[in-house]
């Protein structure tokens, strides 16, 4: 139905779109000037200048795909081996794969089927028998923007510089990869091993394949030389002369917008890859002040792809009649891959020593209210997808025995059950003031999330209300994010009792990575902890089970391990998820472009940019060609 609306309304909207693109300030890029920083050119054999737009303030609407919700603030750099680039359109790693518009990974991850699809590499990666070494080959057709081949040596240099300067690649995968070697076009990845000679974690090596952008060795050496091999200088280099392998490159960027232009010499048009160029010539992202501004632009047809939460999004087509689509035509509208979670702070004895208190609070929370109000039903309920360690996807749901844990699960708003659990544990109100005590003192907790994160704040209000219903005082606290992020990542903090953060969504290493975030002790005591187990929960039995999973290949044994871990999680309740949620939101306006990812075409709704989701750029069609 939405597709029909898109086509019916397109004729009326498209004229307005051309006019709507012009505002008090130019919303599009001007062509590069002669004195702009020199960019690396496309292959010399067929070299052309980037196309010049006749109107300097307006890109051709029927050649431009507009985004919202990805780029916030001005781009800092184009340095793919650096840090703090704030370059979301060109240099960003997502939970479901790297954003490979300009810089490419060896493989692309598809969260819909869990598959790894070759990008720079052929579909031939293979482990040796004991999973200590992986081999793969680089595609013969793969080229850099300067026309030189992408080689195995580029992969090696990307790895070595990452380790040397401790950039994202080096720090993320350094514990799991010992070294990488090149043998012609063959890449040999040597896994890090433990004292027994076993690989530390083969699953994280798979994450490297889809999560580490490959940089050109020659360019890396150029940057290192001009920075005198100083790690800090290399990390902060602007990278204006960067060489790329992807289908788009930088065209224009300031504090108002970022524009990338298609490289018409892109190697991926070879038959061994896509066999054609992506459809849009330009990728543009206006830098909006906030989510409401981006939503307004989406409604007006000034944005094609919007990565923002939009409450009651169905009203945009049901009530407003706008040609706006989501991945699913019905709720939850998107593919829910992650679970925003309330974490208990185990540094507080009242929580660390009382599993009954932890579970009682979790049982009392009205999740249906959270899903209806905070998520406007853009999440399955916990009655539809009972809680576990898994996201709602079919692949993960098949990894544990549902019947074996059914008696431990809860759907929420079970006030009587929660009260009975507290009474049985001796956590009672002894002085008649309506609040329960522990060790002679009233239990007083807070429920915390960043100020301005409105759907999370709505969730914390429901948690606090649940506490009141069962006689446990819970007050809400909403610090500014700049404060919040320094506190919840401090392993010794005692300021926040119940606080929100999301575990990983989908990747080649999931659900293992998420389970480790929920129950593993690897992150306990880690300073500036952005990695997991933010509540500092320790369970030796769970940790031993977690460590077996990366080396387990038998499916039945995997199910047994994940089932045992789910039993521990639902019994101990070190945290509790409040909803299911997409890892990225994906709303599209079909007044100019159509044939976006949907549940019929096998392309994941990763905003046409992340992992295998980039395939969408090759399938788009103009509503009015």
Q: What is each model feature region?
A:
Residues 93, 97, 111, 210-277, ...:
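Gly/Pro-rich hinge or "lid" segments in bacterial periplasmic/extracellular proteins
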Residues 66, 151-158, 185-188, 246-247, ...:
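Alpha-helical secondary-structure segments
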Residues 162-164, 169, 179-181, 251-261, ...:
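Extracellular/periplasmic solute-recognition and catalytic clefts
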Residues 67, 147, 298, 304-305, ...:
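Periplasmic binding protein-like
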Residues 68-129, 243:
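N-terminal lobe/hinge region of extracytoplasmic solute-binding protein
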Residues 123-168, 188, 294, 350-353, ...:
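Aromatic- and charge-enriched surface segment that lines or borders ligand/interaction sites
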């Amino acid at each position: 139905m939405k597709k029909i609306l898109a086509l019916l309304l397109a004729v009326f909207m498209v004229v307005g779109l051309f006019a709507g693109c012009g505002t008090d300030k130019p919303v599009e890029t001007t062509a590069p000037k002669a004195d702009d920083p020199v960019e690396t050119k496309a292959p010399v054999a067929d070299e052309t200048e980037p196309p010049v737009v006749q109107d300097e303030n307006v890109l051709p609407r029927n050649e431009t795909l507009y985004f919202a919700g990805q780029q916030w603030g001005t781009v800092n750099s184009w340095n793919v081996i650096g840090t703090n680039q704030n370059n979301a359109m060109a240099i960003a790693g997502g939970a479901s794969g790297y954003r490979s518009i300009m810089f490419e990974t060896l493989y692309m991850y598809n969260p819909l089927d869990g598959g790894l699809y070759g990008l720079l590499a052929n579909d031939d990666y293979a482990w040796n028998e004991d999973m200590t070494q992986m081999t793969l080959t680089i595609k013969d057709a793969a080229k850099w923007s300067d026309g030189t081949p992408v080689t195995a040596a580029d992969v090696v240099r990307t790895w070595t510089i990452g380790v040397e300067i401790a950039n994202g690649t080096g720090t993320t995968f350094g514990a799991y990869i010992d070294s990488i070697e090149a043998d012609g076009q063959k890449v040999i990845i040597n896994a890090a091993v433990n004292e027994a000679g076993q690989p530390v974690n083969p699953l994280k090596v798979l994450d490297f394949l889809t999560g580490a952008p490959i940089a050109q060795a020659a360019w890396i050496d150029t940057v290192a030389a001009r920075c005198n091999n100083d790690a800090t200088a290399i990390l902060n280099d602007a990278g204006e002369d960067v060489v790329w392998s992807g289908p788009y490159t930088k065209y224009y960027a300031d504090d108002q917008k970022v524009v990338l232009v298609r490289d018409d010499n892109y190697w991926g048009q070879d038959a061994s890859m896509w066999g054609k160029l992506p459809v849009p010539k330009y990728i543009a992202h206006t830098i909006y002040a906030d989510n409401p501004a981006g939503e307004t632009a989406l409604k007006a047809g000034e944005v094609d792809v919007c990565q923002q939460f939009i409450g009651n999004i169905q009203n945009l087509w049901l009530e407003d009649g706008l040609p706006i689509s989501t991945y699913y035509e019905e709720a939850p509208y998107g593919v829910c891959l992650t679970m925003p979670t309330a974490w208990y702070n185990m540094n507080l004895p009242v929580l660390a020593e009382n599993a009954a208190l932890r579970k009682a609070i979790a049982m009392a929370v009205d999740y249906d209210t959270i899903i209806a109000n905070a998520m406007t039903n853009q999440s399955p309920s916990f009655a539809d997808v009972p809680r576990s360690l898994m996201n709602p996807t079919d692949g993960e749901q098949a990894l544990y025995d549902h019947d074996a844990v059914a008696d431990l699960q809860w759907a929420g708003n079970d006030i009587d059950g929660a009260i009975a659990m507290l009474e049985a544990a001796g956590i009672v109100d002894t002085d008649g003031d309506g609040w329960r005590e522990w060790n002679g003192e009233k239990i007083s907790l807070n429920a915390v999330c960043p100020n301005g994160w409105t759907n999370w704040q709505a969730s914390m209000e429901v948690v606090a209300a649940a506490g009141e219903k069962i006689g446990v005082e819970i007050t809400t606290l909403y610090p500014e994010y700049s404060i919040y992020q320094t506190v919840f990542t401090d392993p010794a903090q005692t300021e926040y009792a119940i606080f929100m953060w999301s575990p990983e969504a989908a990747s080649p290493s999931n659900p293992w990575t998420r389970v480790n975030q929920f129950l593993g002790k690897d992150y306990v005591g880690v300073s500036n902890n952005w990695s997991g187990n933010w509540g500092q929960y320790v369970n030796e039995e769970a940790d031993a089970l977690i460590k077996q999973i990366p080396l387990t290949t038998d499916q039945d044994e995997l199910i047994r391990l994940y089932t045992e871990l789910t039993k521990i999680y639902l019994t101990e309740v070190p945290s509790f998820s409040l909803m299911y949620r997409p890892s990225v939101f994906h709303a599209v306006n079909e007044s100019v472009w159509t044939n976006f990812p949907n549940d019929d075409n096998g392309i994941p709704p990763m905003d046409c940019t992340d992992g295998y989701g980039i395939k969408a750029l090759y399938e788009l069609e103009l509503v009015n060609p």
